[in-house]
Amino acid sequence: MSASVQSWTDRLDGKQAADVSALLERATAADGTAPVSEQGVHAVSGAGSDGVRHLVETDADRIVGYAQLQPGRGDHPAMAELAVDPAARGRGIGGRLVAEVLSEGGPDARVWAHGNLPAAQAVAQRLGLIGARELLQLRRPLADAELPELVVPEDISLRVYRGVEDDPEVLRVNAAAFAWHPEQGSWTERELAERRAEAWFDPSGLFMAFAASDDQRLLGFHWTKVHPKQGDEPAIGEVYVVAIGPDAQGRGLGRLLTLAGLHYLRDRGLGAVLLYVEGDNESALHTYDRLGFERFHTDVAYARA
């Protein structure tokens, strides 16, 4: 067996990007969960990848491991994601990738373990890492399940996305609502354009709330998403982004907008819906618990102790 070699690059070439994408697909099929986030997948192809660095581990010119390092911004640490080809596991590749990205990312760097699978836990224990952040995936059924009635208060106007004319307000509220969030809070027009170009994008699934007396200043929005059927897995809806402006908190808009999206997804014939929420976001967890969501799996960001 030949020794594998690691190398860093600021941008994957066309063949590397295709090989990494195929590796990620194999890892997803083997593990039942994607090893790299949506934002990370975009960065593989070079989209929205300012400052992102890529680490590939090759064996006889074949990519057997991949890691991606998102740079730190302000108070937010560098974040890494990685995957090992299922056919090359059990050779220490995952541990080497983790050690290298943490070294390159600086003392506060973190590495995601999506699904927190046993192999990832074993690597973390071996390297003396601790869980520094949790991202929970919650799910609830839609088919044959009751949903509360959608009642829009008289002082609120609810409508769907009309196009790029709405983007400035969407970005303003998103940045304010997720100022604490290292990935979501940094969205720009580029991120919106990338997602509008996706096959799943449907403007009628992006709900926007305004004061009835002011239809220019957005209070909050809920962007839904539909994941298509994959193999034996049926299509599933997602509460993709719920953002409420800080000046509109405490008015029940999170529940209202979430419920509007759930009715929309159910009306599209979807049997279930998922969402992601930070493990320490007690307010959001309370809202989703009341709407019938239950924990499905957990992503953990590991850091040095």
Swiss-Prot record:
What's the protein name?
Mycothiol acetyltransferase
Subunit notes for this chain? Monomer.
- What does the similarity note say? Belongs to the acetyltransferase family. MshD subfamily.
Q: Which UniProt keywords apply?
A: Acyltransferase, Repeat, Transferase
Q: Which SUPFAM superfamilies match?
A: Acyl-CoA N-acyltransferases (Nat)
Instruction: Read off the PANTHER family from this record.
Output: L-AMINO ACID N-ACETYLTRANSFERASE (PTHR43617), MYCOTHIOL ACETYLTRANSFERASE (PTHR43617:SF31)
Q: Which GO terms describe its biological process?
A: mycothiol biosynthetic process
Q: Domain N-acetyltransferase, which positions?
A: 10-153, 156-305
Q: What class of enzyme is it?
A: transferase
User: What InterPro entries does UniProt report for this protein, alphabetically?
Assistant: Acyl_CoA_acyltransferase (IPR016181), GNAT_dom (IPR000182), MshD_Acetyltransferase (IPR050276), Mycothiol_AcTrfase (IPR017813)
Q: Which reaction does it catalyse?
A: 1D-myo-inositol 2-(L-cysteinylamino)-2-deoxy-alpha-D-glucopyranoside + acetyl-CoA = mycothiol + CoA + H(+)
MF terms in GO: mycothiol synthase activity; protein-N-terminal-alanine acetyltransferase activity
- Coiled-coil portions: none
Species this chain originates from: Rhodococcus jostii (strain RHA1)
